[in-house]
Design a protein with these regions (language model features):
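Conserved alpha-helical scaffold flanking the Walker A/P-loop in AAA+ ATPase domains
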Residues: 41-45, 98-118, 147
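Walker A/P-loop
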Residues: 46-84
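P-loop (Walker A) phosphate-binding loop of NTP-binding proteins
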Residues: 58, 92, 160
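Canonical AAA+ ATPase core
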Residues: 99-104, 125, 129, 137-230, ...
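C-terminal engagement/docking regions of AAA+ P-loop ATPases
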Residues: 2-11, 15, 247-332
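Conserved AAA+ P-loop NTPase core
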Residues: 80-112, 168-177
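Walker B catalytic acidic pair
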Residues: 57, 120-121, 132
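Pre-Walker A (pre-P-loop) alpha-helix and adjacent loop at the N terminus of AAA/AAA+ ATPase modules
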Residues: 14-61, 241, 245
C-alpha cells in the first residue's frame, strides 16, 4: 500500500479519514462532473457500517458511473447486476454446479460476492429475488443448499430505480427500503457542468475512465473504526431521536420512520464529522442527512401516495420545527 493510502486501524486518526476522504472525492470527480455534495454523502454511507444506498433518478444521470467510480477509488471489487423480471435468486447468489471433469458438485459464487454491488433497476426483479438481496443486505451472508457463506467486508449495495416507470416493476417492500441507509437523487447537471462533460470526453478521446485506488478494503475498515470514536453529545442524540419520532406523529404520515432511521442519522453524522476533520457531531450534521436518511422510510396517508415530493416536504418541515439543541461546548 503506498504512503497516500489509509493507515491501518492502530495508526489511523480523524485527520487521516478527512485527508483520505478528500483524495477519494477528488478521484471520483475525475469521472463524475459536479455533484460534490451527493458524492460526499455517498462516501459517508460507504464509510458507515450497513451503508447501503438507493439512487432514484432518471436514466443517464451517472448512477452506474458513480457506483463504479467509488469502487475504483476505494480499491474495492465491483459487480453490476441488471435486475429483470426473470432474474432468479440463484442468478445473484450463485449455487452448486456439477463439474463433469471432477465428477462432483462445486460452488459457483454469484455476483453478490463483491465489495460494492450495483443493483441496477432493482424494482424490476421479482419479490423472491429481492428477498435474496435483502438477506445479503441484512445478514452479510447468503445461504446456498443449507450452507451459509459470508460476504466480503466491506459489503455495500448501491441500488438504482427510475422514479417514473411503474409498468413491469415490483415496488420495494417497506422492509427492504428500511435497509437502505439513505436515498438520494443525483439530479441533472448545470449547463456549465454539462459542457464540462463534453469537453472532458472530447479531450479523453474514449468513453473509458482510468481511476486509481486511493485506499483498499483494509483501509475502508480502518476508517470505519476511527469513525466509531467520533463523539456524539447526548443532546444531539436526543435530537436524532426527536426528529425520527416526529415522523410518526405527523398528520400526513401513516407509518413513520423506525429506530433504524435514527441509527442511520447517527452513523452518517459521525462519518460526515470525521470527513470534516472533527471528532464530534454537531446538529447541522444531523440536519444535512435528515431528508436522505428518513424520507424513504415514511408511508404517507393514501391521499398523498401520488405526490412524489410529499415525504421530502414532511422531513423538511420537521427539520424546521423540531427544537435544535445548543451545544455549550464541543468535544475536543
Amino acid at each position: 500500500m503506498n504512503e497516500e493510502r489509509v493507515m491501518d486501524g492502530r495508526e489511523a486518526t480523524i485527520s487521516d479519514v478527512a485527508a483520505s476522504s478528500q483524495r477519494i472525492i477528488r478521484e471520483v470527480e475525475r469521472a463524475v462532473v459536479g455533484k460534490t455534495e451527493v458524492l460526499r454523502k455517498i462516501l459517508a454511507a460507504c464509510l458507515s457500517t450497513g451503508g447501503h444506498i438507493l439512487l432514484e433518478d432518471y436514466p443517464g444521470l451517472a448512477k452506474t458511473l458513480i457506483a463504479n467510480s467509488f469502487a475504483r477509488a476505494l480499491g474495492l471489487s465491483f459487480k453490476r447486476i441488471q435486475f429483470t423480471p426473470d432474474l432468479l435468486p440463484g442468478d445473484i447468489t450463485g449455487g452448486y454446479v456439477y463439474d463433469r471433469a471432477e465428477g462432483a458438485f462445486r460452488l459457483r459464487k454469484g455476483p453478490l460476492f463483491a465489495n460494492i454491488i450495483l443493483a441496477d433497476e432493482i424494482n424490476r426483479a421479482s419479490p423472491k429475488t429481492q428477498s435474496a438481496l435483502l438477506e445479503a443486505m441484512q445478514e452479510y451472508q447468503v445461504t446456498l443448499e443449507g450452507e451459509t457463506l459470508k460476504l466480503p467486508d466491506p459489503f455495500i449495495v448501491v441500488a438504482t430505480q427510475n422514479p417514473i416507470e411503474y409498468e413491469g416493476t415490483f415496488p420495494l417492500p417497506e422492509a427492504q427500503l428500511d435497509r437502505f441507509m439513505l436515498k438520494l437523487a443525483v439530479g441533472y447537471p448545470s449547463g456549465d457542468e454539462e459542457q464540462e462533460i463534453l469537453r472532458r470526453r472530447r479531450e479523453r478521446r474514449q468513453d473509458e475512465f482510468s481511476l486509481r485506488a486511493v485506499t483498499d478494503a483494509a483501509g475502508v475498515i480502518a476508517m470505519r473504526q476511527v469513525i466509531e470514536t467520533v463523539h456524539v453529545d447526548s443532546d444531539v442524540e436526543r435530537y436524532m431521536v426527536e426528529l425520527t419520532r416526529a415522523t410518526r406523529r405527523h398528520r400526513h404520515v401513516s407509518v413513520g420512520a423506525s429506530p433504524r432511521g435514527a441509527l442511520a442519522l447517527l452513523k452518517l453524522s459521525r462519518a460526515w464529522a470525521a470527513m470534516e476533520s472533527r471528532d464530534y457531531v454537531v446538529p447541522d450534521d444531523v440536519k444535512r442527512f435528515a431528508p436522505a436518511a428518513l424520507t424513504h422510510r415514511l408511508i404517507l396517508e393514501p391521499d398523498l401516495w401520488t405526490d412524489r415530493r410529499a415525504a421530502g416536504d414532511v422531513i423538511n418541515e420537521l427539520v424546521r420545527t423540531v427544537t435544535v439543541p445548543v451545544l455549550q461546548e464541543t468535544a475536543g
